[in-house]
Amino acid sequence: VMDNEGVKLAVGASGGRRITNCVTQVINNVLDFSMSPQDAIDFPRSDCSGSYVNLDSRLDPIVVQGLKDKGHLIKLIDAVFDPTGMSGFASPIAITRNKNRLNAGVDTFHSAYAEGY
């Protein structure tokens, strides 16, 4: 994502068909809600790329019930570290640039970390 000063945000993910949902949510969280990259990644997610709508179990139960009431098939996914790397969501990374400062975020539910110098 670019702004008048150049690169503002870079986002990527591993996770096959789940990548598009994940990257879109991270971009929205950073740009629309002014979240840091880490907060944007840590925020409860959803994924509708399969037969079920995978929802982060940390989502408000009212939201979950509202989707069920509309006929969506819901699968709640617990947000816990999975050493196998298998979960119901893609595994994102993101970097923002503000002038000469870089901030990064990684998926803490997989074995990943951000490092810089």
Give, region by region, the residue ranges found by the protein language model.
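Proteins synthesized as precursors that undergo proteolytic processing into mature forms
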Residues: V1-I77
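Terminal-appendage/accessory-domain detector
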Residues: M35-S36, Y52, S57, I62-Y117
